[in-house]
Swiss-Prot record:
Pfam families: ABC_tran. It catalyses: D-ribose(out) + ATP + H2O = D-ribose(in) + ADP + phosphate + H(+). GO terms for cellular component: plasma membrane. ATP binds at G43, E44, N45, G46, A47, G48, K49, S50. Residues 11-251, 263-507 form the ABC transporter domain. GO terms for molecular function: ABC-type D-ribose transporter activity; ATP binding; ATP hydrolysis activity. The keyword Mitochondrion does not apply. Part of the ABC transporter complex RbsABC involved in ribose import. Responsible for energy coupling to the transport system. The gene is rbsA1. This is Ribose import ATP-binding protein RbsA 1. It comes from Burkholderia lata (strain ATCC 17760 / DSM 23089 / LMG 22485 / NCIMB 9086 / R18194 / 383). The keyword Nucleotide-binding applies. The complex is composed of an ATP-binding protein (RbsA), two transmembrane proteins (RbsC) and a solute-binding protein (RbsB). Belongs to the ABC transporter superfamily. Ribose importer (TC 3.A.1.2.1) family. It is a peripheral membrane protein.
Length: 517
């Protein structure tokens, strides 16, 4: 049933507030969702999206005064079981599956079928396998009910979560950043499933920071800011400028605006020649100039991250040269790269970039703490001053520099990592998925920093899976396919940087068309 066929909302959350010690996370928030609707929920990290959904899912109890209605009936959701019984299912970024159990066992978890006595009888795994065959077929799953979850890909595990929601007859499905771990092809398949569920009458609440996904899927979009409800836009009224202004509370015109001067083609900062490893990168060459922002695009698995790590010296290369200015450095030496003025921001900040159990101050200073050494001890005051300056310069939202990095939002974590790299005074900066998992406000700050660096003559390489981002920030774009540079767009090639051109190079369709003619 579509929204147009059902004038009555399926879900109404009215006047929802939630207070934690010293923090009011939600203040009188309301949300209305119809059956057969994809309703996106947007807001910066810390806006209250997750808190609102945790109240809906029974993980949190709202403060007194608000109410939740399903089909017009007030519901008391006092825990996850009550939410499930009310027809609410949530698929979090961190999937909630038991890897050592089968698909069927995960679908039936907490509702196991038993032989004989329903409470004490032995689990009837064969009956559970039969019982979930229909839902797996309905979702076009390529695996069976007896498959061990641990053997499935992330996309397939996500499908198990969706199957569990459908099997429990959920009517309201919440999806929190579901495409973050997925490839482009897996994302397309997920979108087909979401649309299918909408046609079947489910109400889908979709949380994402990705504008392209919001435009593609949403029937309506509601925005939260600082724990309050800002407003709801119909699909026909959506625009990036309007959504961003609602989220951050101010107008951000020219979201991707290039504010640096054209780069100097006569001032070469980085020269990479015929670089290769033994698997994923096959003889790539590139140049980067002072004040230039060079984008690197391509499909997942094309070798973009591998190329960046080879250039930086984080992975061994079997051949090729890397030169910063006139300095060539070794085949496997990040220290030499940093000394030459080349730094790399990893795509996985939590596992490869940050020390989550250490303070903001220590994370910012760790790459340059040798500067503060005095007679065998560290000048802590100097490090504290450096951290304060970085917090102010990059607009890092944090009470003070002693807070652990693990407690910060994704956007603020990314800015802490970026500030650490900038303390080394780089000439070349490689940013691998710099805005992944960060909110709109943090994205705009990162774009501002990129522009400022380019204006100062730093050469910046941006690797991104978001085509609007690549097109918006880059002077030139290199497109990778199967470990090689498939083509170049923009700059002095006079070839326009467009999504169609990037996709054609990334998929090989441009080459296929040329061969056909």
């Amino acid at each position: 049933m579509s929204r147009s066929e059902s004038p009555r909302p399926l879900l109404e959350m009215r006047g929802i507030s939630k207070t934690f010690p010293a923090v009011r996370a939600l203040d009188n928030v309301s949300l209305t969702v119809y059956p057969g609707e994809i309703h996106s929920l947007m807001g910066e990290n810390g806006a209250g999206k997750s808190t609102l959904m945790k109240i809906l899912s029974g993980a949190y109890r709202a403060d007194a005064g608000g109410e939740i209605l399903i089909d017009g009936t007030r519901i008391d959701i006092d825990g996850p079981l009550a939410a499930r019984d009310a027809g609410v299912a949530v698929i979090y970024q961190e999937l909630c599956l038991s890897p050592n159990l089968s698909v069927a066992e995960n679908i039936y978890i907490g509702r196991e079928l038993r032989r004989g006595n329903r409470r004490w009888g032995t689990i009837d795994r064969a009956a559970m396998a039969r019982g979930c065959e229909d839902v797996l077929a309905r979702l076009s799953a390529s695996f069976g009910p007896d498959t061990l979850v641990d053997t499935l890909s992330i996309a397939e595990q996500q499908l198990v979560e969706i199957a569990r929601a459908v099997h429990t007859r959920a009517r309201i499905l919440v999806m929190d950043e579901p495409t973050t771990p997925l490839s482009s092809r897996e994302t397309e398949h997920l979108f087909r499933l979401i649309r299918q569920l909408r046609e079947e009458g489910l109400a889908i609440i979709y949380i994402s920071h990705r504008m392209a996904e919001i435009y593609e899927l949403s029937d309506r979009v509601s925005v939260l800011r600082d724990g309050t409800y800002v407003g709801t836009l119909e699909r026909a009224s959506l625009s990036a400028e309007r959504l961003v202004a609602m989220m951050v509370g101010r107008d951000i015109s020219g979201f991707y605006k290039k504010e640096h001067a054209p780069y100097d083609p006569g001032h070469l900062l980085l020269s990479v020649r015929d670089i290769a490893d033994d698997a994923r990168v096959r003889g790539c060459s590139l140049d980067l100039h002072a004040g230039e922002v060079l984008g690197i695009a391509g499909l997942v698995g094309a070798g973009r991250t591998e190329l960046a790590r080879l250039i930086f010296g984080a992975e061994p290369r079997v051949r090729g040269d890397v030169k910063v200015g006139e300095r060539t450095f070794g085949a496997h030496s990040p220290r030499d790269a940093i000394d030459a003025g080349l730094v790399y921001l990893t795509e996985d900040r939590k596992r490869q970039g940050l020390f989550l159990d250490m303070s903001v101050r220590d994370n910012i200073n760790i790459s340059v703490c040798n500067r503060d050494a005095r007679l065998g001890s560290l000048d802590l005051a100097r490090g504290a001053e450096r951290a304060r300056d970085a917090i102010a310069s990059l607009s890092i939202r944090v009470p003070d520099a002693n807070v652990n990095v693990g407690a910060l939002s994704g956007g603020n974590q990314q800015k802490v990592l970026l500030s650490r790299l900038l303390e080394t005074k780089p000439r070349v900066l490689i940013l691998d998925e710099p805005t992944r998992g960060v909110d709109i406000g943090a994205k705009s700050e990162i774009y501002r920093i990129i522009n400022e660096l380019a204006r100062a003559g730093v050469g910046v390489i941006v690797i991104s899976s978001e085509l609007p981002e690549i097109i918006g920030v880059a002077d030139r774009v290199l497109v990778m396919r199967e470990g090689e540079i498939a083509g170049e767009l923009g700059g002095y090639t006079q070839t326009p940087i467009t999504q169609e051109a990037i996709i054609a190079l990334a998929t090989g369709s441009q080459a296929e068309l040329a061969d056909a003619h």
